[in-house]
Curated annotation (Swiss-Prot):
Transmembrane segments: 13-29
GO molecular function: hexosyltransferase activity
One Pfam assignment: Galactosyl_T
Any GO CC annotation of this UniProt entry: Golgi membrane
Chain spans, region Disordered: 35-55
Protein name: UDP-GlcNAc:betaGal beta-1,3-N-acetylglucosaminyltransferase 9
Keyword Transferase attached: yes
Alphabetical UniProt keywords: Glycosyltransferase, Golgi apparatus, Membrane, Signal-anchor, Transferase, Transmembrane, Transmembrane helix
Species: Mus musculus
Family as reported in the entry's similarity comment: Belongs to the glycosyltransferase 31 family.
Gene name per UniProt: B3gnt9
Amino acid sequence: MRRRRRPRLCPDAWLTLLLSAALGLLLYAQRDVASPTTRPPARGPQLPRPTPSLRARELPNTARAAPLAYEGDTPVPPTPTDPFDFGGYLRAKDQRRFPLLINQRRKCRSDGASGGSPDLLIAVKSVAADFERREAVRQTWGAEGRVQGALVRRVFLLGVPKGAGSGGAGTRSHWRTLLEAESRAYADILLWAFEDTFFNLTLKEIHFLSWASAFCPDVHFVFKGDADVFVHVRNLLQFLELRDPAQDLLAGDVIVQARPIRARASKYFIPRAVYGLPVYPAYAGGGGFVLSGATLRRLADACSQVELFPIDDVFLGMCLQRLRLTPEPHPAFRTFGISQPSAAPHLRTFDPCFYRELVVVHGLSAADIWLMWRLLHGPQGPVCAHPQPVATGPFQWNS
């Protein structure tokens, strides 16, 4: 009697099964990675720089964290797809105080341990998973120390990762431990207990103003921006040399006569019940702006008396309006990036000869930040046809 053979899978079939399993694990591991973004849309004739910032309605339980990627490439920030819950926003509009989970009490101490009160404090909006960009900022334009004789200090502003209070611990639920270790290593992490979402940047704004007023009362100037910007700190300090930190100043890429978006299909839709005026007050694009210590302290008080608004940079413009202050436009702050001129479609905009004449450029990856830093600060420096000082006047395209 002939024995029946067992069926065997050929090597190609085994390889296919293994690859399918690996792909499934990869997709499962990346399914929940999410982080807010503050990158603005393209500038239009009547559109504001939208940076929606909706407040959290619950204090997240940070003891039970959802899975969070902390390794590999920088996560791509998603845009919101769900409708803006204005009813929930209005019901929770008075909830604006959240505990500080990680602090840097000695960041601006003048006891000699940290070098005294800083001339420039750099505050960068970040999210827990974005270690790659934080490290790029630390090692390039955001490095602490003396720059042209000015003392520069740095902090990153974070909230609790989205979904951290919804339960479901996983293999990547160690975000709090990692942030605490990062804080011990660099002493530059500020973490609050509100959920860090696309809509919560206004909370980050008011909590930072309150923190800086309490822990950095003698700071001369503050630069506040996103983690995907490149800042030419020497140009910024050159601009600030002639400014008095005791006088009011808030300078950046200023947007005026921006109209609220009334189209319900837009993710930046603002109903008339929330804002009924035809235009927003003048405001500086949230990608990066600089303010004096005097203005910071006044803003901290004014913003505590202004109802929160779901667009953080517009909200800051409302606080300035309450103080009867006007933001100062500066052409070297490019929070919408460097536009490609229509007359020169082949012109390379990612060029150190352009960046050396600017203060802020928004919309760079971590790799681009590293590369531009090396191009500008390498041993040879940028080779440009017309070297000239920067941050002293309007930016012009060289022919």
